[in-house]
Each structure stands twice: as C-alpha cells, then as structure tokens.
UniProtKB/Swiss-Prot annotation:
The gene is TMEM50A. It comes from Homo sapiens (Human). Its main location: membrane. The keyword Repressor does not apply. It comes from the Eukaryota. It holds the Pfam family UPF0220. This is Transmembrane protein 50A.
Length: 157
C-alpha cells in the first residue's frame, strides 16, 4: 500500500532545523492571537450580560498568566543545567513550572465547565460565547505548549 504523499515533491535544500525556533514562535503567536481574537469577537457580538457573562474572561486571563509562567522557565533551569542557582534553584524552577501547568490545565477545565454548565446544560439558544471561551483557552494552552517545547535552547552548539 503506497502513501498518498509519495507524489508530493519537497525540496531537500530547505533546512528546517535552523528555522525551528522561528517557526515554533510564529505558530505559538498565531495560536495565542487566535484565542484572544475569538473571545473578543464573542464579546463584541454579545455585549449584554444576559448572553455572555463577561466574568468568563477570567479564564483567558489565567491562561495567559499560565502561558507566561510556563515560558519564563527554561528547560535548562528545570534540568539543573543553568550556571547560576538563583533564588530557589532547580527546585524553584520546577515548582514555578508546575504551578504554571496547574493554572493552564485549570483554566482549560474551567472553560469546559463554562461551556457545558453555562450554555449546553441550560439549553440556551446562543452557545457561541461558551464555545468561544473554550477555544480561547484551548488555543492559548496549545500555544504555550508549542512555545515551550517547540523551540530549542542549543543555538551555539
């Protein structure tokens, strides 16, 4: 059985290894922007509190803080490869990263709760604000993962 991509010609002269950080950063930025764009769109379409409770923006703010916390710690600091110990050293970096991931997963779970508890279970006519809250948090979460694990730190080796 042959693959369906065998006929696709891809130039071997493109070196994606050197552009990995650039591509990962752009992809993470697009995901982050898309998440906030979706929730801003929902807030503009449904400005009343009856259709869209604007306290639901807290999930996106917490996801953004988690995005920043996760990416503030380098992989070298978590592994203990850094040259200076800093304030708390490797243990502090791991705790910081753990709290960041807890906030990220918590905001994603809370956005699902908002979608299903606030819109689907109540059988509201308008479900788009709940979907927007979920997709905002999902895009920010996956953008944070791409930005954290899609880049390399060994630029000079």
């Amino acid at each position: 059985m042959s693959g369906f991509l065998e006929g696709l010609r891809c130039s071997e002269c493109i070196d994606w290894g050197e552009k990995r950080n650039t591509i990962a950063s752009i992809a993470a930025g697009v995901l982050f922007f898309t998440g906030w764009w979706i929730i801003i769109d929902a807030a503009v379409i449904y400005p009343t509190m009856k259709d869209f409770n604007h306290s639901y923006h807290a999930c996106g703010v917490i996801a953004t803080i988690a995005f920043l916390m996760i990416n503030a710690v380098s992989n070298g600091q978590v592994r203990g490869d850094s040259y200076s110990e800093g304030c708390l050293g490797q243990t502090g970096a791991r705790i910081w990263l753990f709290v960041g991931f807890m906030l990220a997963f918590g905001s994603l779970i809370a956005s699902m709760w908002i979608l299903f508890g606030g819109y689907v279970a109540k059988e509201k006519d308008i479900v788009y604000p709940g979907i927007a809250v979920f997709f905002q948090n999902a895009f920010i979460f996956f953008g944070g993962l791409v930005f954290k694990f899609g880049r390399t730190e060994d630029l000079w080796q």
